[in-house]
Amino acid sequence: MSQALRPQAIKTSTTGSSLADILERVLDKGIVIAGDITVSVGSVELLSIRIRLLVASVDKAKEIGINWWESDPYLSSRTQELLASNQQLLERVNLLERELAATKATGVIKKGVLGTPFFIWFYDLV
């Protein structure tokens, strides 16, 4: 008439969770670790370290507004492209500076309307 009581297994929060599952949850939610370390002798503080560590997935970091790796040229996949572009710009600036120096040597610089300089070019007509 009465049912026999059978012992039931105790359920824990880690049942069926592997390391990969836990890591996925941590990266999905994000975790912040904060700490302060101070080294002092007597009342003189010698060293103070403030540690703030955020562990999160890239998607979660972007969601909370952290995306510094996108603008850092050393971490970007476009590093080579940016370096090549910078080299081209430097070469162009050098060329323009040489042309300006040559113009100053052969042309006359006068003050124009409202005091802005303009160049009078001298050409050799053949």
From Swiss-Prot:
Entry GO MF terms: structural molecule activity
Keyword ATP-binding recorded: no
One GO CC term of this entry? gas vesicle
Q: Cellular location of this protein?
A: Gas vesicle
Disulphide-bonded residues: none
Q: What is its main location?
A: other
Domain of life of the organism encoding this protein: Bacteria
Q: Which UniProt keywords apply?
A: Gas vesicle
Keyword Magnesium on this protein?
Answer: no
Tell me how this protein assembles. Interacts with GvpA.
State its role: A minor component of the gas vesicle, might be involved in nucleating gas vesicle formation. Gas vesicles (GV) are hollow, gas filled proteinaceous nanostructures. During planktonic growth they allow positioning of the organism at a favorable depth for light or nutrient acquisition.
Belongs to which family? Belongs to the gas vesicle GvpA family.
Know the name of this protein?
Gas vesicle protein J
Source organism per UniProt: Pseudanabaena galeata (strain PCC 6901)
